[in-house]
Regions:
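Anionic-ligand binding patches
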Residues: 2-4, 10-206
Length: 206
């Protein structure tokens, strides 16, 4: 089955293609299909809705938009990092925390600066991911995943993307960026969301 992936993020493309190939899905980036303007993400802020619903709203919005545009099933996700002490920032704004969408270096540096006054338990946070699959006939399935850790004030590791070099996993003694893709897919927020989605798809007979 062919499914369109609503992202231009190369890291996400690699992760989704690897995992969904397990059920025979051919995951094709939207950029390989058509030059379609990206939808504006209008997920409500955390102060107005719970974290999960904000991510879910954005994931569904993207998937619905592209499913209508290309008339094919679309896979989308919305994810981000949450620093508990900051009142759930960066959250749905993770990819553009420093003002420019997709600038990992700038986003990481801003988070380091904002968290600079905090130490120890105050630096706890988590990654959150919500995945959505939307079909042109209106069917929709969503799944979520979460990964807890500590947001460090220095970088370590060269793998992954986003905030992975800052996100330390005490149980592994590594940052997310130090994990292999196989390790990351087992324990990351996105890996857990994919696991939940694959289970739901199987239960639905898809």
């Amino acid at each position: 089955m062919k499914v369109i992936l609503a992202t231009h993020n190369q890291g996400k493309i690699r992760e989704f293609q690897k995992r969904f190939s397990e059920i025979g899905w051919e995951v094709i980036p939207i950029s390989d299909i058509a030059d379609i303007p990206e939808p504006e993400e209008t997920g409500t802020t955390f102060r107005e809705m719970c974290i999960r619903d904000s991510f879910r709203e954005n994931a569904l919005q993207k998937a619905r938009y592209y499913a209508e545009a290309v008339n094919l099933p679309v896979l989308s996700d919305d994810s981000g990092i949450i620093a508990d002490v900051l009142g759930n920032e960066p959250g749905v704004y993770s990819a553009r925390y420093a003002g420019v969408h997709g600038n990992d270096e700038a986003n990481n540096q801003k988070l380091v600066e904002v968290l600079h006054p905090y130490r120890g338990e105050a630096r706890r946070g988590h990654y959150m991911c919500v995945i959505a699959v939307v079909w042109p006939d209106g069917r929709e399935i969503t799944a979520e995943g979460r990964c807890n850790g500590i947001i460090r004030d220095f970088y370590k590791g060269t793998g992954g993307f986003g905030y992975d070099p800052l996100f330390y996993l005490p149980e592994f003694g590594k940052t997310m960026a130090e994990l292999s893709m196989e390790e990351k897919n087992k324990i990351s927020h996105r890996g857990k969301a994919v696991d939940a989605m694959l289970k739901k798809l199987k239960e639905a007979g898809i």
